[in-house]
Amino acid sequence: MTGLGAVTPLGGDAPSTWRAAVAGESGIDFIRAFDASEFPVRIAAEVKDFDPSQVASPKDARRLDRNVLISLGAAREAVADAGLDGVYSPDRVGILFGTAIGGFISIIEQADVLRERGPDRVAPTFLPNVLVDTASGQLAIALGFRGPNYAPVSACATGSTAVGEAAELIKRGDADAILAGGAEACIHPLVLAGFCSMRGLAAEDEHPPRASRPFDATRAGFVMGEGACVLVLEELEVAERRGATIYAEILGYAMSNDAHHLAQPDPESVGVGEMMRRALERAGLEPEQIGYINAHGTSTPLGDAAETRAIKQVFGDHAYKLAVSSTKSVTGHCFGAAGAIEAMMCVRAVHDGVLPPTMNYEHPDPECDLDYVPNQARPVQVDVALSNAMGLGGHNGCVLVGRVP
């Protein structure tokens, strides 16, 4: 991995996102995008102070969906960070970039136009602008990369799937470099209402940054987030020859499904456990070689307990020696972007020798009894880190990243 780009609730670029996560600074606050005063939940982790004109033409800044615009910001940063311009033939650079929902806000806006102004006023760009693959296609147009390009969709595991599949494409020889990641921008009254109806969200009116409490006994739900993250992957030997900054390497990757419920985790954690075992096997690693897990850790009562159970099943006694943290305690849950953002957290953790904390962890839960790096970053060098991602529909993905000496 030679380039990182991010637009998140913690900052407008990858370095500021990482610094804030390590410092335990929260991106969770009262919703600004609309008046949420009539909702039982009024908080979210929004991308703040994003200026579309910095990443797109005035025309595109007006017509493209927010999820595409923040994707452009993350992608341009990652390409610049990797020094990728002119290195490879455009035909050999691919893009695997997904989203869970796509151009949701544009769909609602055009539905309002149809209802209020009639069918003749619906924008001709409406349909191309809201597809799940719009962002991956628009990134290719903006950057000129003509290699393999598609939009993996696995709900909240989308970003993880994109990163893992990108590595597989490069291994097969289908591309020399891949931009991989995900984005989501769906903080909207309808989405908020839907999650409120599911009773999945945390409500914290007095102090929003305390709402997301992964693995804490008082956790009461997740916090909606938004963001985009792109990681540039290349062949290790080629990156070394050209003198690129190498943050980390991908050692293994696996997917699975719970085959249990569309919205609830399997309490036995069979699918998640099998996924981690398979990733370790593919990487040729023993469980004892893993030093850090960036957990899916959404702060839901069922989800955090199930993930902890899976970690203990796979790692045995070593589970209690592992460091496990959830950066969703400060980013909220960025859905399709989450897996990519958290893969980036693992990359920086092994590269920088510091583990980001789980904030707001104050009350131990007997079902969640591991080392969750509570409330303060931990300077420690780990050689291998694992990023877990789980999504609605039972989709699971994990990526193993290793330090490059």
Predicted regions mapped to residue ranges:
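Conserved beta-ketoacyl condensing-enzyme motif
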Residues: 1, 18, 22-154, 183-192, ...
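Condensing-enzyme catalytic core mediating Claisen C-C bond formation in acyl metabolism
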Residues: 1-2, 25-30, 206-283, 291-292, ...
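Active-site-adjacent elements of ketosynthase-type condensing enzymes
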Residues: 36, 40-45, 102-106, 185-212, ...
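Active-site-proximal alpha-helical scaffold in enzymes
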Residues: 71-83, 135, 140-143, 148-184, ...
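Glycine-/small-residue-rich "gating" segment that lines the acyl/pantetheine channel
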Residues: 116-123, 161-164, 168, 177, ...
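Short pre-catalytic strand/loop immediately N-terminal to key active-site residues, enriched for Gly-Thr
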Residues: 122-127, 147-154, 216-220, 322-333, ...
